[in-house]
Each structure stands twice: as C-alpha cells, then as structure tokens.
Amino acid sequence: MFQFGESRVAAPDRITDFEIGTDKIDLLNRRGGDIGAPDNFTRAPNNNAPTLRRLVNQVFRNADGGQPGQQELAPNSAVFVRATNPDIRGTYLVINDNVPGFQPQNDLVINITGYTGDLPGFGEIPLEDFFVI
C-alpha cells in the first residue's frame, strides 16, 4: 500500500522484490482511505536526467513513450520510467495525485529497481496488471 504524500521525490520508497504479473499496488489518499487504481497507466521513454527531481519533472511533461510528441501525465495517472543516468539509474513508478502538474509533497515516486518479470513496453499499460482494481 502506498499513501499519497509518503513516498516523495525527496525520499522515495524502494521495492526490491516486486513481481510483475503477481504483485499489485494499492493506493491510499493522504487520510489513509482507499482510492483505487489510477485512471491511466503508461511507460515513458527512458530518461537520462541527472537528478530524480528532474527525471520526474520530465516524466510529467512526457509520460507516454508509445506516442509521438509529448503527452503530459494527467491527474490520477501513473507512469513507469527507466532512469539511465548512473547517478539515479533504476526503474521508477510515478503516480500523479488528482491535481494537475507535479506536486513534490504529494505525488508518489517509488523505486522498483530489482523487480522480476518483464517491464511493459512503451505506451499504455493495463491497470489490472499492476494495481488493485
């Protein structure tokens, strides 16, 4: 379970044993109430940003690597991104709350480096594959 406001860009949680296709993520609001799955889930293009904050800002501007051009991360949406810069290398799950734009004190940033299974390709990802519906 992840509660908005707890796994932030300044101090992201880390999951080292996430099993793609088996494990599911359950989301909670700031008061601890269940909010269900995001409305949309995509995989962003791989990103070479030098800091996690810059990576997340760029993902908010281009959240769908399966589409040409840039598609902003919509409110109540989630995205996978692979960071390729050695300083922050890894795979991250970024989840926007219900407020447009990046809210560093509330939006979730979770490091899932160490997952098992195949990371989905760029573009749309079925919600039920990763989230409690």
Language-model-detected regions and their locations in the chain:
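Acidic, glycine-rich calcium-binding repeat modules characteristic of RTX/beta-roll
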Residues: M1-T51
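Low-complexity acidic/polar repeat-biased segments
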Residues: L52-I133
